[in-house]
């Protein structure tokens, strides 16, 4: 049995990191979160632009906030509310605690003494949580506890040949050992619906796959017009890609060859599902990563051909570069990428050898090795899938 050393949480789930998160219940409290970060080095501040005045989308934000804060990579949460926003911060905190069992401390500026008092109390509580987190010890757990999130961004013509198949190799390995893999970016599955539906575990799952991809294609055409299939990002074109369909055939390689067990809406909790699962979500990288983490991914793997350096604040994100030119242009072995998948082309490495290299690297990361985005502090912010970010 394959095992790794993780942090077992009160609800039985396992984290690969041990963070104390400080987050605003609505974006009007972001400044307070930043003050707490300055007072208490070691906490992870989560900055966002949500929490109020988003009619029709608030249920999604509430789900994401609770999902993110319940991820087992977090030891404890400091939640700061203003008081006049749509949801009560203390009620949200109680929900997070019920789901995760983790320590949660919530304060409301308009009820708990104003900004300075809340900053002081939250800072004191954050220090206690950091001390508690420092007492946690990693324990040996089976790989079946892993939820592995996959992502690609800034793709080029080699992404579907080198980096994405390497992630697919890792995905198949995780599934074979009882774990869970998340494949997303539905806009980048357009044209592959029959391929993916053919891998579905049941006719019902196949129908879900076709539905989400066809719905996404209609949305893309609404925004981009009848030539939508030819419109891809400028960087993708510069990297040698030509159409959404070509890009999609490379994108889905991140899911390997395993049977697709289910389809989830954006950021919905994984709730014990095993095997390969599609999460409905956009191609926009920070939004996609937020959804993967909310669903339950403790570790992420992100391929790039053009050299996107983005990570995620609360999860290790292994950056795999599809080509050696970009890898060395961005610093090489001491630069912005974790793994050079271009070695398949320039060094004669076989695809399976690259895949095993990625497996070995991921195992080190699960056991505590920092990824490049973690070392460089390139976590980014929370971004949520909404009507304003449809693709």
Where are the regions that the model predicts?
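Metallocofactor- and cofactor-centric catalytic cores in central/energy metabolism, strongly enriched
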Residues: 1-391
């Amino acid at each position: 049995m394959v095992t790794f050393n993780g942090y077992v949480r009160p609800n039985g789930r396992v984290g690969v990191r041990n963070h104390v998160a400080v987050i605003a219940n609505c974006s009007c409290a972001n400044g307070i979160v930043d003050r707490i970060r300055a007072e208490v080095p070691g906490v992870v501040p989560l900055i966002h632009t949500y929490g109020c005045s988003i009619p029709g989308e608030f249920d999604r934000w509430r789900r994401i906030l609770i999902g993110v804060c319940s991820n087992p990579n977090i030891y404890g949460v400091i939640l700061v509310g203003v008081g006049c926003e749509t949801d009560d911060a203390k009620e949200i905190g109680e929900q997070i605690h019920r789901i995760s069992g983790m320590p949660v401390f919530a304060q409301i500026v308009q009820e708990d003494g104003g900004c300075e008092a809340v900053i002081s109390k939250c800072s004191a509580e954050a220090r206690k949580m950091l001390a508690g987190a420092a007492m946690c010890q990693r324990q040996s757990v089976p790989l079946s506890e892993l939820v592995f999130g996959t992502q690609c961004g800034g793709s080029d013509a080699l992404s579907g040949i080198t980096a994405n198949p390497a992630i697919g190799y890792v995905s198949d390995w995780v599934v074979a050992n009882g774990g869970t893999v998340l494949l997303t970016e539905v806009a980048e599955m357009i044209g592959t619906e029959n391929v993916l539906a053919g891998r579905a575990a049941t006719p019902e799952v196949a129908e879900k796959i076709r539905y989400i991809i066809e719905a996404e294609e209609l949305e893309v055409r609404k925004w981009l017009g009848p030539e939508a299939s030819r419109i891809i990002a400028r960087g993708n074109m510069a990297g040698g890609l030509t159409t959404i369909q070509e890009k999609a055939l490379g994108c889905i390689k991140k899911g390997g060859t395993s049977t697709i067990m289910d389809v989830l809406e954006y950021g919905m909790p994984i709730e014990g599902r095993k095997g390969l699962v599609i999460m409905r979500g956009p191609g926009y990288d920070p939004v996609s990563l937020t959804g993967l983490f909310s669903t339950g991914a403790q570790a992420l793997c992100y391929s790039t051909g053009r050299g996107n350096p983005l990570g995620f604040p609360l999860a290790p994100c292994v950056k795999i570069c599809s080509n050696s030119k970009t890898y060395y242009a961005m610093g090489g072995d001491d630069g912005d990428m974790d793994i050079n998948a271009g070695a398949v082309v320039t060094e004669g490495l076989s695809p399976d050898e690259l895949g095993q290299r990625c497996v070995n690297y991921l195992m080190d990361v699960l056991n505590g090795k920092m990824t490049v985005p973690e070392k460089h502090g390139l976590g980014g912010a929370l971004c949520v899938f909404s009507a304003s970010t449809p693709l």
